[in-house]
Amino acid sequence: MKKRILAFTLVLAMTLFCFAGCGKKQEAVKDTPDKTMTDVTLNEVAHSIFYAPMYVAIEEGYFAEEGINLTLVTGFGADKTMTAVLTNEADIGFMGSEASIYTYLGGTEDYVVNFAQLTQRAGNFLVAREPIDNFSWDMLKNCTVLGGRAGGMPEMVFEYILRKNGIDPMADLDIDQSIDFGSTAAAFSGGQGDFTVEFEPHATALEQKGDGYVVASLGEDSGYVPYTAFSAKKSYIEAHPDVVQAFTNALQKGMDYVQSHTPEEIADVIQSQFEETDKETITTIVTRYYDQTSWKDNLIFEEDAFTLLQNILEESGELSQRVPYADLVNTEYAQNAAK
């Protein structure tokens, strides 16, 4: 735990200038009446189809309808997204909620508070070198798996699934954590590992190239977990409650859209967010997430979900003590948006 807190401290000291030039102004698709607009910078942990409801809200003009002029920045990691929020490079962060726990336990006075939960399942997949019709998790024993960063949600959920299936992550297999996030698919194509844990679009890309085959969904096998949420510094929420409410309202409209439209329709809306990916591939990926109920129908971060998150952190050896739900989660804005 001390190492995890130290990691965030070092990031604060070393990465203050990582975010310049990375922002993209998100233009409203719909015409909106003249109104006073508020600039909001949102730093997302990654740019992924997994977060489709947020991109629907952008592309359908829901943020503009709520009076928000949104700039979206990709942080490429929860540590960097958290740093952007804590150093006022971003107003709102979108990342795994474990980051809020780490900073809280690290003694940050103006800590971040989660106010809206977007995803309720893990968004990554286990990829094998050959198709496996009747996959079982014990097939990973004595194998090498390309995994994720220690202390991050992808890796902790993977280890959580292993333990649920009677597998010791430390003793029964070799989890290679030496490869940077985003580079594991290329390493797997190059011959490293027997399996790899991949987000989209990398999982589908491996299949399309014939280099790998999805054999399991971590989202399905883990059950419901509070995977990603929106958060802001306590002081920002206190100073700008109307902005936080408007932001959450826009997100809820995006959630409503994905609940009432087909994967094909969702793919049509978000395609401009992923210009390097063809429409058919986007539809395939959206369908995967859609079929496993990745997205909640509301944004309320329930207490039992937060308890499960702390259970996962504790089992992974990343939590030295429990933190209060009431301190790190505010459901007021999500509840209002869901009405």
Predicted regions located by residue number:
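Secondary-structure end/capping motifs
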Residues: 238-320
